[in-house]
Each structure stands twice: as C-alpha cells, then as structure tokens.
Amino acid sequence: MARNVTKRNKRCRGHQKAIYKKKSHSSSESGLRNYSLYINRVLKEVVPQKGISSRTIDIINTMINDMFERISTEACNLMYYRKRCTLTPEDIEKAVYLLLPEKLAKYAVAFGKEAVQRYVRS
C-alpha cells in the first residue's frame, strides 16, 4: 500500500521544526471507532426489554465520533493558544465546556472524571 508523507509545522514554544507524518489512504485506518457494542450494552442496562435498529446505531455512532473529533480539535486549539506542547486534562475539560451547554458540560466533565478515577484505581 502506498503511503504519502505530509509535512506539518509544529507550533510549540521553541520548536519550529517540521514534523513528518505518514498518511494512509486506507478506509480501515480512517481513525473512526465503532461504538455499536457499547451502545447495545448501555441500552440493555437501561431498558433490558427494548432493542435498537442498526440504522439508529450507525447514527449514534456517527454522533459520538463527531463529538470526539470536535472536542479533540477544540482542545488542540486551546493547547496552541496557551503555547503549550502538552495536551492536559484541563484543555479537554475547557473544550467540553465550550462545546456543550452548561448543564450538560457539567455532567459530562463530572462523569468523565469519575470514569478516569475508576480506571486509575483498577
């Protein structure tokens, strides 16, 4: 499989060196994840007797991928505005607060912190 090499300028403090990143044109390496298994698991926990169509799962999966992409883009922009080379949890938290309505962002950040703590403890 042929791969192209793209050139990006790194905008970190003190580093103006170009970064070379391999770029693949394969559809399997597009970076999008499939969350259908997790969507079904959550549905069975919440409403055990109900099902969900594959089209609905595809729509929810697209929404999840889109939201993760928006959060990562906004967090990356915040990182560059602060002239930092490291993405911190605070950048992600601020990105969530910028993208989501106030109450929803508050719950998302709280549940996200709790999930990270459970992961660290296990």
Curated annotation (Swiss-Prot):
GO annotations of cellular component type: cytoplasm; nucleosome; nucleus
Chief place of localization: cytoplasm
Keyword list, A-Z: Cytoplasm
Subcellular localization, as worded in the UniProt entry: Cytoplasm
Basic residues bias (residue ranges): 1-25
Source organism, top-level taxon: Eukaryota
CDD domains: HFD_H2B (cd22910)
Chain intervals for the UniProt region annotation (Disordered): 1-30
Signal peptide coordinates: none
GO molecular function term, any single one: structural constituent of chromatin
Tissue and organ expression note: Testis-specific. Restricted to the spermatid population of seminiferous epithelium. Not present in Sertoli cells, spermatogonia, spermatocytes or cells of the interstitial tissue (at protein level).
Pfam families reported in the protein's UniProt record: Histone (PF00125)
Record family assignment: Belongs to the histone H2B family.
Role of this protein: May act as an acrosome-nuclear docking protein in sperm.
Name of protein: Histone H2B subacrosomal variant
Gene: SUBH2BV
